[in-house]
From Swiss-Prot:
Gene that encodes it: accD
GO terms for cellular component: acetate CoA-transferase complex
Name the UniProt record assigns to this protein: Acetyl-coenzyme A carboxylase carboxyl transferase subunit beta
Function field: Component of the acetyl coenzyme A carboxylase (ACC) complex. Biotin carboxylase (BC) catalyzes the carboxylation of biotin on its carrier protein (BCCP) and then the CO(2) group is transferred by the transcarboxylase to acetyl-CoA to form malonyl-CoA.
Molecular function GO labels: acetyl-CoA carboxylase activity; ATP binding; carboxyl- or carbamoyltransferase activity; zinc ion binding
Species per Swiss-Prot/TrEMBL record: Ectopseudomonas mendocina (strain ymp) (Pseudomonas mendocina)
Length: 294
């Protein structure tokens, strides 16, 4: 019996372990909507949209900018700016420790990335929120990078686009974070005075101080399908009003139906459709229609 264990069973277990370890981590991804198990390389081809149920999964800010902007001529805006714990804030953890953990997890200094570049050859300034960095919360650096991007748009006489994904103002920066609502709104007012378009793209989720400021100030407000958009979350509202909310409440389709946003565009159509829209707003020749990615 012992020889059989040594000669047959143990090598079999070892071979099984080798097979398990040979499968790279992260090769498969489970759709949070339909539970389909998806092959990661195939999912990347669909821009992280489930091919089974069309669920638009959350993607990082750099991935967002990479699929939106032309490949050449990109320049990051405000990359040297880093958050500072001016208030020495502490809740269950020190704010500086939360920042360090978020920076290590995401590889980013803060929750917004801004770039100048081109879209189908048209100069453009673009911002994208990184939701993985403290819930995409807006603090001093997020506000400053957004304003710098707006200033680039003013200097270059080009449009500004922002992809929002945020839980709202950053609690750990208190009034400093709330001030960013006014600061970013003032920057957008300057763009409007100069006749330069701002397109706000709402992705899942957009809440709090971001939804109450820059995200809803677009000349055109676009959303991805089924994105959650609001000020307070549905559970908070239900507890306050003590009523059951309507089906699909705070989803982008609900907001479109009630006139709060202008259009819903699937992720694989955002680049060509926004390029054509911005060309019209900037009185430029419309770019050649791009093939829609499957």
């Amino acid at each position: 019996m012992s020889n059989w264990l040594v000669d047959k069973l143990i090598p079999s277990i070892m071979r099984s372990e080798v097979k398990k370890s040979s499968v790279p981590e992260g090769l498969w991804h489970k759709c949070p909507s339909c539970d389909a198990v998806l092959y990661r390389p195939e999912l990347e081809k669909t821009l992280d949209v489930c091919p089974k149920c069309n669920h638009h999964m959350r993607i990082g800010a750099r991935a967002r900018l990479d699929i939106f902007l032309d490949q050449d001529g990109r320049e990051e805006i405000g990359a040297d700016l880093e958050p500072v714990d001016r208030l020495k804030f502490r809740d269950s953890k020190k704010y500086k420790d939360r920042l360090a953990a978020a920076q290590k997890q995401t590889g980013e200094k803060d929750a917004l990335i801004a770039m100048s570049g081109t879209l189908e050859g048209m100069p453009i300034a673009v911002c994208a929120f990184e939701f993985s960095f403290m819930g995409g919360s807006m603090g001093a650096i997020v506000g400053e990078r957004f304003v710098q991007a707006a200033n680039v748009a003013l200097e270059q006489r080009c449009p500004l686009v922002c992809f929002s994904a945020s839980g709202g103002a950053r609690m750990q920066e208190a009034l400093i974070s709330l001030m960013q609502m006014a600061k970013t709104s003032a920057a957008l007012a300057r763009l409007r005075e100069e006749g330069l378009p701002f397109i706000s793209v709402l992705t899942d989720p957009v809440y709090g101080g971001v939804s109450a400021s820059l995200a809803m100030l677009g000349d055109v407000i676009v959303a991805e399908p089924k994105a959650l958009i609001g000020f307070a979350g549905p559970r908070v509202i239900e507890q306050t009003v003590r009523e059951k909310l309507p089906e699909g409440f705070q989803r982008s389709e609900f907001l479109l139906e009630h006139g709060a946003i202008d259009m819903i565009i699937p992720r694989n159509e955002l680049r060509p459709r926004l390029a054509r829209l911005l060309a019209q707003l900037m009185n430029r020749p419309s770019p050649v229609a791009l093939p829609v990615t499957a």
